[in-house]
């Protein structure tokens, strides 16, 4: 309970800082744009589409999520009026089948209160990359209507700083920040490339981390009041984005944090986010004591729902008690048929919308304070379709499900998982603010058709699309599609409490940062380690940076530990590094870490922990993993 309280206070401090910096305290209830981009309407509005989809025949019909006809008429030129429709997903069809003969429409319940600043319902939009300037306002409006609190964008360092210290004029990254912040959305930005002048291998971190410091300082200044949070790198732990070790990720994190805070002390400096659930990389980052240098611990996952408890437990263990942000997650579906459309089957569209609600519910239950579903725009990788919108901004059913989660799980905090003898039932209770009213909200589904008894009838019940559902008495009829049951606050249910947050680790950032620079070819990525050749002296370049305003003098120590298959009488390897060092303000000082006596005789791996005590400048830590190899 104590750790839960501390985590809640940390989260509240972050939200308060966001509101103060971005003017989010003035967030209002959004209204649709007059043009109704994406054919998204609110209940009570007359649904009108500008034109019918292409197709044969002289009639059309509109059907709901279940395929039931709700309107029909004869083909004519000009706008087509469907009348006032209840919450739901609809398609206008010109023929019995064929995605090219369909046009989708979404009807949402309008928000009854502004979306809370602490609501966990967020989404990855990547607006700067996916939408031209003229569509950005429309996309931001759709996010706001869906009750989204925070959005994730993308930036390109090479575009923003094509030459060192020469920044681009106003461009798509500024436009996207302006459009989203103007809609009341809290913007998170992320980078994943170095410009060629900082590293010829663009997928790797800059060689000189002062370049990262300067870039993030200037971006935090440039977008103050518009971009409230930054991830310094995307998925640095996989080869696509550089294949970095946990140690390298920690060094970048420390420098980026210092730069961001120098540019805007109120900005949220997120951890450069993990792609993989790899224990070695997680441990490596943690050993480098990076926790004073991130405000939130960020991760991604695309694993099956039954893997969530173990996955979150492992990340939570190295989170240092910081708020968990999941900035990409989903259990996606495949597309089939016409490769120009890349559209899932009708059945998979239903599955996508059902999984979206479950993704939010389970991630929040595991302790995530911000959950960014991946992804709003139409986006495919291979045969996988991730997007909840189509290229023309019209919705897939999952967008309507997104709006239901945004409204009904607004400000959701987990209370626990319902204990029930039926193992097919999944039911998670939250304290939330559905429609602006504090209540307990139960999200429940089942792998088989069954029923769940409640202590008393719910105040209201909605399906995963946000459509009102009648409940007879105290019984919820469940199937694979989640239900949202709104209960009175304090409703007593038999609960398994949510996982406790990790213990909050204490520490202060140091202005001194250390970095090892090794070629990518020397990395053993699955072990988050570098290769050390047996029988040879291995030299590792170590760089010390001073981001303070005064010279720093400190003492370095290099204790080693070994993972061995047999007892070691004496340390088989030796590490040599100058014991005393001075670093001027702004300096990047190179030292040589020399390893001698490297052998494979019983040693499977070694760790070197360089600790620098720099007095008022603070304590610097660099931990490196090594594996011996034989040429």
Each model region followed by its residue ranges:
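C-terminal beta-strand-rich structural cap/linker in extracellular carbohydrate-active enzymes
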Residues: 472-515
